[in-house]
Amino acid sequence: MASHEIQKVWADGCFDMFHYGHANALRQSKALGDYLIAGVHSSLSINQEKGLPVMEDEERYEVVEGCRYVDEVVRDAPFVTQTSMIKEYGVSIVAHGNDIVLDSSGQDSYCQVRRMGIFREVERTFGISTTEIVGRMMLKNRGSWLDGENGESSKDSGYHDRLLSLFMSSMGREKRGKVVFMDGNFDLFHAGHVASLRIARGMGDYLIVGIHDDETTKEYTRSYPVLSTKERMLTLMACRYVDEIVVSPYLVGSEFIKRHGIDVVAPSFDSKDLSRYDGIKDVVEHSYAENRFNYLSAEHIVNRIISNYQDYANRQKKRTGK
């Protein structure tokens, strides 16, 4: 019997401010073949075609490399998907969402691979995009998209539940060995989170991530997170270092530790209040592995967006004289 030829799938993009819509596109792309290659555009090429991304190159590479559906990352992939690159990597399928992506000249970015007959569409994820996230952050009008006691959007909760079920099917690692726990709100998922989770996973054999729901997050940050609990869970589920996700309290006690069979608690790099672990000090272990993205935070990202907008406005003013 002839051996099965591995089908390589190519999916490229900016993957700016990585969210569960990106993850879902990569999940669907992986399902089209056996091996998924993710091409990530550089900030230079993105800026030439559509404007400066919020996240820098290395930050976007780190997050995409941390996605469980991705087998290989090609850095600085061209904005217009080239047949030469497809042939170089032995790709048989090119996948992208069912929307048309145009370059700065108005040309379809996938025109070359469409002509080759290897282009496949995947469904876009409802209600989420980088633009949507930026809009939520800038407007700060959370009352318009969060309702109900726990802050979940009642309109979209059924859709999110279906996605959670699909994402869950990719998380099947057996719980054994040394169990590590890390918690936080993981809002605006970024390279700092990914690096922190990678380091924590390296401290044991199985990583449980505790996510703080919307109301808990509001209690200790004084504002709702930008993304709802289910939205944040979806993005975490796509991270290859995460084995299990639970909704966890802000104050982690010994009963919680015993119930989940946790051996080690690893505070996230951005944990500001370590006193909440006072009742379980004997299992708290700080990793001193370097997190080169420890400067990232929601505030830092917001400041970038404001700065990028000002740069854009200034360029437009010079261009139009207005």
UniProtKB/Swiss-Prot annotation:
Its EC number is 2.7.7.14. The keyword Lipid biosynthesis applies. InterPro entries: Cyt_trans-like, Ect1/PCYT2, Rossmann-like_a/b/a_fold. Pathway: Phospholipid metabolism; phosphatidylethanolamine biosynthesis; phosphatidylethanolamine from ethanolamine: step 2/3. One of its GO terms (cellular component) is cytoplasm. Keywords: Lipid biosynthesis, Lipid metabolism, Nucleotidyltransferase, Phospholipid biosynthesis, Phospholipid metabolism, Transferase. Belongs to the cytidylyltransferase family. This is Probable ethanolamine-phosphate cytidylyltransferase.
